[in-house]
Amino acid sequence: MEGGGKPNSASNSRDDGNSVYPSKAPATGPAAADKRLGTPPGGGAAGKEHGNSVCFKVDGGGGEEPAGSFEDAEGPRRQYGFMQRQFTSMLQPGVNKFSLRMFGSQKAVEKEQERVKTAGFWIIHPYSDFRFYWDLIMLIMMVGNLVIIPVGITFFTEQTTTPWIIFNVASDTVFLLDLIMNFRTGTVNEDSSEIILDPKVIKMNYLKSWFVVDFISSIPVDYIFLIVEKGMDSEVYKTARALRIVRFTKILSLLRLLRLSRLIRYIHQWEEIFHMTYDLASAVVRIFNLIGMMLLLCHWDGCLQFLVPLLQDFPPDCWVSLNEMVNDSWGKQYSYALFKAMSHMLCIGYGAQAPVSMSDLWITMLSMIVGATCYAMFVGHATALIQSLDSSRRQYQEKYKQVEQYMSFHKLPADMRQKIHDYYEHRYQGKIFDEENILSELNDPLREEIVNFNCRKLVATMPLFANADPNFVTAMLSKLRFEVFQPGDYIIREGAVGKKMYFIQHGVAGVITKSSKEMKLTDGSYFGEICLLTKGRRTASVRADTYCRLYSLSVDNFNEVLEEYPMMRRAFETVAIDRLDRIGKKNSILLQKFQKDLNTGVFNNQENEILKQIVKHDREMVQAIPPINYPQMTALNCTSSTTTPTSRMRTQSPPVYTATSLSHSNLHSPSPSTQTPQPSAILSPCSYTTAVCSPPIQSPLATRTFHYASPTASQLSLMQQPQPQLQQSQVQQTQPQPQPQPQQPQQQQQQQQQQQQQQQQQQQQQQPQTPGSSTPKNEVHKSTQALHNTNLTREVRPLSASQPSLPHEVSTMISRPHPTVGESLASIPQPMATVHSTGLQAGSRSTVPQRVTLFRQMSSGAIPPNRGVPPAPPPPAAVQRESPSVLNKDPDAEKPRFASNL
């Protein structure tokens, strides 16, 4: 029984963890034998392992509990390891916005964390989370010390009270801990911006810099002095010397104010942090720092104003005794002292009264010097800070002041000054940036990203960019330059040399041509590319109807980009041909190149579909409107449409024609009213056949050739609407009464015109008429009549003194009457006798020529002489004598209709 109980007791002892008994003898007897027989072969080993408490493999049930005890021992170790890792991570720089700005990327931050781990034990990184929160606590403690300590030293006589001692001991302890941490905190090398983590280098740098000041401000020198004095004879302490000791202790307590250096350093670090993260927060922090420093200096000065009389036992001539404030409360004493100090520092007076004693006088002068210096520094810093907050607006104001001085120097008129002011307001919007310089300093990917973002609205509204290669869009946008045009500004002028093309970001512009239609361009449209493709002159004028914000592209940059993207060049050329077709013009260079591309087969199906979509969108974006300046204009007013802008400016009234031109043979049946034509939204491609009625005024070529179709009635009906006809009574009212002249030349001219009318009617009847035409056979087309009746090279001279010469198109295209005159230029009688109407004139009346060459207009408005065709013979003397009588008309009849009184 005993032998059986011992194993149980042994097993119980194993359960308790006491498995080793060195003083116990080994068991003997049958029980021991039974135990040896009953114990498995591995039982001894298992028991041995259990006795050593290191059991990783257990046979049977004897090893389960030691494994649980091992897990119980590992729990505190794991918890300690977790806390140690957390605390170590706080000493390392965290992945935050500030550290990413400092080191550049997350990989660099992780590399810096590894440096901290390998630097040594308890090395604190200056940008770690632990140092951040510790500096925040130290900042609050320093502000409290710098405010409370001067008040306690000055206005409280008892320095040994329990609250005061607790406050001083706690603050001194915290500052001593900060002193120790500075030996383990890494420093930043100002030369290389590298963070030093070597403990030896950190220690040497701190000992050479701020250690002495921090050590003196952290040691409680006043309490050490009091402890030493209390160890001496108590009789001595109670004598008059005790008062001096207290005074000296107060002075020693002022050494804690040297903690101001730490405050300045910490504030500077926080300014750097806010400056690198938030510009506005940095400005706010700087403003609060300036205000706080001014208030702190005023607080110290106020305490000094009262401390000096206190150390002198309040002499009778000091300001405290004069105001009878020796026994007042400390709040009243502090208020008067602060008012006196701020009056000195702000240079606005001496406070309640002027200083009397010598000590007050010197303190007042010191306050004035310190206050003036601080005030100047505050004003300077505040001014620089305000200017730095909005430097772009300040640059705009300086720039506009120069513009105002320029306008005053040149004495520009008021309306022009207003236009310049409006331009600057819409162009810069109150801020000026050197955008070109800013973008040039960036790398290519960042610059392209910025340009794509700035022009996102243009890309979104422009079909050409929507269907183009993204690389082409980026290359094109990087070459653009921003421009602004005011309402009424001519962006491009017809006939000028083209050096830029424009993309409309926002605004409305009108395309002005010589036809009876004006087209509008809106957001996403572009123009001016035709000259860049052909190296020619402008084919139309574009005028801004509203404030237009455009992007311009120079010809060099245009060609540079299109050389890399030939498909986009073909897209520009296709759209240019379609646009010229819509305004009734052609360009041989573009047509030849387009035909060459078709013959060579460079277009594939995909490109054809893309080009069709681009042309379709371009037609949809262009808005065609009827003319608004000529409400009574007929369908093809060749007289006004072919007049140059210079001649219109020079001539304020339509030309005067002879009264004899209004014969009965030239008048048709009257129409109810003159109707304004209603043009279609988009001109059809067949408008090339009518291009002769609206040729360009200032062409880059010396001559321009236009093709005529056969003069059928259907085409005549397309080219000209029925002209308003006057009754005979209306003609008599509009005709001025000429002076009596011989009637024989007039009768000859009328007979000649009647013969010409009959011949033309016979020719019209002989020609086949197109089916579906509504034009009667006896209708005479005005433009063909002018070609029949006159020589193409003959110069038609005006009869108005206000118009020196008409443009050359009048001699080739005279198709409709002027609204105010009511007669056609085709009915002007030819100033020549019947005997001269032979030869070339007869040949020209026989048929309509298939090709008509229009000469370029000269500066004087006349036509250069034709070298290929001999000039017509001069008119007879009888007709020359008749012209003066034609000009001698009633002046009263002409005044309401003409600007010049003839």
Swiss-Prot record:
Activated by cAMP, and at 10-100 times higher concentrations, also by cGMP. cAMP binding promotes tetramerization and formation of an active channel. Compared to other family members, cAMP has less stimulatory effect on HCN1 because part of the molecules already contain bound cAMP and form homotetramers when cAMP levels are low, this inherent tetramerization in HCN1 results in a weaker response to increased cAMP. PROSITE patterns: CNMP_BINDING_1 (PS00888), CNMP_BINDING_3 (PS50042). Residues 154-162, 226-249, 308-333, 356-360 are extracellular. InterPro entries: cNMP-bd_CS, cNMP-bd_dom, cNMP-bd_dom_sf, Ion_trans_dom, Ion_trans_N, K/Na_HCN_channel, K_chnl_volt-dep_EAG/ELK/ERG, RmlC-like_jellyroll. A motif (Selectivity filter) lies at residues 347-351. Residues 889-902 have a biased composition (Basic and acidic residues). The chain crosses the membrane at residues 132-153, 163-183, 205-225, 250-270, 285-307, 361-381. Residues 334-355 dip into the membrane without crossing it. Homotetramer. Heterotetramer with HCN2. The potassium channel is composed of a homo- or heterotetrameric complex of pore-forming subunits. Interacts with KCNE2. Interacts with the SH3 domain of CSK. Belongs to the potassium channel HCN family. This is Potassium/sodium hyperpolarization-activated cyclic nucleotide-gated channel 1. It comes from Rattus norvegicus. The gene is Hcn1.
